[in-house]
Amino acid sequence: MRFAWTVLFLGQLQFCPLLRCAPQAPREPPAAPGAWRQTIQWENNGQVFSLLSLGAQYQPQRRRDSSATAPRADGNAAAQPRTPILLLRDNRTASARARTPSPSGVAAGRPRPAARHWFQVGFSPSGAGDGASRRAANRTASPQPPQLSNLRPPSHVDRMVGDDPYNPYKYSDDNPYYNYYDTYERPRSGSRHRPGYGTGYFQYGLPDLVPDPYYIQASTYVQKMSMYNLRCAAEENCLASSAYRADVRDYDHRVLLRFPQRVKNQGTSDFLPSRPRYSWEWHSCHQHYHSMDEFSHYDLLDASTQRRVAEGHKASFCLEDTSCDYGYHRRFACTAHTQGLSPGCYDTYAADIDCQWIDITDVQPGNYILKVSVNPSYLVPESDYSNNVVRCEIRYTGHHAYASGCTISPY
């Protein structure tokens, strides 16, 4: 048994030198500058594939030599923290660069494009082993990263002409059909500050309001509502005088002749409110300002005598550009506290909003004339007042109303 252990121990002593002294495989000589270099190799189904490239060779992460130490204040040597670095080397090898003679007129510390190295993390020189070569590489490294090419300064010339929704007058001519052509065909000539709301650029001519008779005829109907739901309307005096008696209760009903309204400004200038901005009246119930005492007036006339049978009321709504024709832009909005009607735009009031009616609770069934007037008191100058009135024939049965023959009328 002792002899077997001795033989095993001597065999291991003879086998270890054989492993250490075995000749290692010779390393391949460095590739010549500009030669193809194998960068990626893989095997699939017994076949070996290689991807060759002339680009820079990727060097794996390296750690600093473990023998590199830094002296302490007490004289003892302490190992520096090992920082992994990622070195990207150019296509030229070290031996090829060593054989390249340096010109006499070039300074020794001047970096060359072919010998630059970029480090992914911080690197400090050390005094061990190849410290001199690392210090040389550190000197040749650029102190700052290269500037990114996609960080461009802001440009002010790439904005489009006509890309300002608050400036419908985008051409310097006097054509009232402004902004008719495509506004994205030519670049903006210079920096142009966007003006505020309600600003007119050149107000040549006058506005011209025209109500839409077909819009009224298509959606006229009768509705009954309780006084409880008409509190806001009663605050703005949109009901007949009988609705304000002391004996009227919240569950009493009123009969309303509802109809929509759409007014277009077909002139060449903005239709602006007659009252100055500081005198606009705030209505907390509807949460908007009334900028005119009377923008529209609604009357119900007898068909034969033309006598007023229902108490008409003034409608002083909030003026805004609800919609515009193609090529025109909205510039006035009640929510932005700017009121007016731009050329080519419409101020539309649906039939289901407050005060868009005539109170016909005390009207008997029969044939009547519905008269809708815009700018009735001529408080705002217009180019034509003969198209401000719409007259419709109304047949009221006591439960339903039928509108027909709505036309533009001069009176």
From Swiss-Prot:
Q: Where in the cell is it found?
A: Secreted; Secreted, Extracellular space
Q: Which cofactor does it need?
A: Cu cation; lysine tyrosylquinone residue
Residues engaged in binding Cu cation: 286, 288, 290
Q: One matching Pfam family, short form?
A: Lysyl_oxidase
User: What main location does UniProt list?
Assistant: secreted
Span list, region Disordered: 60-168
Broadest EC class assigned to this enzyme: oxidoreductase
Which residues get removed as pro-piece?
22-162
Q: Provide the leader sequence positions.
A: 1-21
Q: How is the cofactor bound?
A: Contains 1 lysine tyrosylquinone.
PANTHER family reported in the protein's UniProt record = LYSYL OXIDASE-LIKE-RELATED, PROTEIN-LYSINE 6-OXIDASE
Its name, as the record gives it, is: Protein-lysine 6-oxidase
Provide the species name: Rattus norvegicus
Q: Which gene encodes it?
A: Lox
